[in-house]
Amino acid sequence: MTKLSLTDKKNVTAAEKAYNPLTEDQRTFLTEDEHAKMQANSERMQTLIEGETLIKAAEKAIKSLPADTKIKATDSKKLETAQEAYDKVKNSEDGLTIDPKLAEKFETSRTAYYAYQQQAENFRSEYLDALPKDANAVTAEYETAIPAARTAYKALSKNVQSFIEKAEVSHLRACEKTLKKSKSAAVKVDKLIAKLPADVNAEFTAKDEKAINAAWKAYSKLTSEQKTFLEDEQHLLDCYNKAYPEG
């Protein structure tokens, strides 16, 4: 039996159009070999057509998939579609194959996608997980971690950044805002503390007490988190406790 290919589709279709309308009686004039050949050719052509459909679907899906340097998190559905179509071709019993260049493109794009995803996860675990869960609860403990996260984020490619959720970036931004606000508030109080008498054991003058009261008033307005940014909180406490031993 001659091996069929898709180029024989026209001939097989013509044979089917002639064969199918025959009655049972008319078919008796054909030999068993002719019947068998007709059936085998029809089945084989159907298999070839189905294979062609699988190949076209896979190649179409891969063509729509961005290149490895362009692919981002938003292309997950395209990658999933291409993967499913590619697997159907690859796992076909007839050993179907697609255009080698498209197969290579698929492999490189897929590899890049998961590499970017992993880089994003590494950034997340190393930097984002080091941030406070509550953006309003930023203490001096996070003074290095927050800018470090921003620097690391900027260093990521746009591809990798696409795998970082918008909510995560917003949280980082909120932490930065709180850090800036808290440091600014602490600096203002530190400047007032700098005006306090250097020797806490010396007798305080009216001017000293006025400075202590001003510093204490500003200090009292700070949140517990903001107070962690003060450079000389203890000196203020010592001065205040001496000036007001009764509290």
Where are the regions a protein language model picked out?
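Beta-rich interaction/scaffold domains
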Residues: 1-247
